[in-house]
Amino acid sequence: MNITKSYVVIFFLVMLTNSLSNSDILVSSVIETSKYDVCFIPCTRRYEDRECNDDCLAKDFNDGGCVDGRCCCKY
C-alpha cells in the first residue's frame, strides 16, 4: 500500500514540475504578439513577411509581419 502511495505522489510531482517548466515557453509567444493588433493567416515559405505586410496594408493596417508563424497586423 505504501509503495503505491509513493508512486502516486511521485507521479503528481513529475506532472507538476512538467507543467511549470513549460509555462515560460508559452509566455514568450504571448509577449511577442501583444505588440500587434490582429494575427491571422499562417506564414509559410511562400507567404512570408513581405506578403503579410502587403496584405496588412491592403486591409488598412499601418504595418504587418510574421510573428511566431502567423501574419500579424498592427495599427
Curated annotation (Swiss-Prot):
Superkingdom, taxonomy of origin: Eukaryota
Chief place of localization: secreted
Compartments, as annotated in UniProt: Secreted
Disulfide bonds: C39-C73, C43-C66, C52-C71, C56-C72
Gene Ontology biological process terms in this record: defense response to fungus; killing of cells of another organism
Position of the signal peptide: 1-19
One cellular component term from this protein's GO annotations in UniProt: extracellular region
UniProt KW keywords: Antimicrobial, Disulfide bond, Fungicide, Plant defense, Secreted, Signal
Family: Belongs to the DEFL family.
Name assigned to this protein: Defensin-like protein 59
Organism: Arabidopsis thaliana (Mouse-ear cress)
